[in-house]
């Protein structure tokens, strides 16, 4: 299920069927002008890729730093995930959503980086050593 703004009953057409029982999280509509996908890999921002929107808007790096600080306090955080951030029409940097690495696309991340990204999460899920975790070789 993808996020969308529901303004009338017609907007619900195609959102599911009677056999499914989705949990739906509602919020007020936000005017997001630009979005980026932050790839989080072992508690660090691995890369940030533009997702969509108006190039005139840019994110506040101090907000990203705070998001990461808060993320690191989450005890059961994934080894790899994505955090989508956006900038609103009034230039506020916000978290749009967070998703597990195994269910996110590469969105322009280089192939070898994406492979390492996915490997980290799968290794964590299956409680195995990550064969592509090269951090152990760094001084």
Model-derived regions: residue spans:
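Generic, low-specificity signal for short hydrophobic/alpha-helical stretches with a mild N-terminal bias
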Residues: 20, 80, 96-100
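Functionally constrained cores in energy, signaling, and assembly domains
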Residues: 26, 86, 106
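Nucleotide/phosphate-binding sheet-loop regions of phosphoryl- and nucleotidyl-transfer enzymes
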Residues: 2-13, 99, 104-110, 122
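A short beta-strand motif that forms the metal-chelation/ATP-contact edge
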Residues: 37-40, 91-104
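A long amphipathic alpha-helix within ATP-dependent nucleotide-binding catalytic cores
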Residues: 47-95, 114-138
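Active-site nucleotide/adenylate-binding loops and adjacent lid/helix of ATP-dependent enzymes
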Residues: 2-72, 139
């Amino acid at each position: 299920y993808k996020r969308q703004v529901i303004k009338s009953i017609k907007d619900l057409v195609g959102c599911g069927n009677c056999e499914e029982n989705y949990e739906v999280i509602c919020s007020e509509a936000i005017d997001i002008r630009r979005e980026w996908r932050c790839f989080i890999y072992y508690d660090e921002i691995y890369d940030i890729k533009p997702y969509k929107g108006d190039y005139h808007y840019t994110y506040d790096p101090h907000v990203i730093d705070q998001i990461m600080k808060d993320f690191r306090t989450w005890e059961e955080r994934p080894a790899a995930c994505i955090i989508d951030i956006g900038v609103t029409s009034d230039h506020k940097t916000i978290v749009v959503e967070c998703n597990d690495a195994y269910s996110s696309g590469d969105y322009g991340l280089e192939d070898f980086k994406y492979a390492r990204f996915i490997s980290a999460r799968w290794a964590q899920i299956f409680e195995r050593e990550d064969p592509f975790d090269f951090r152990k070789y760094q001084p």
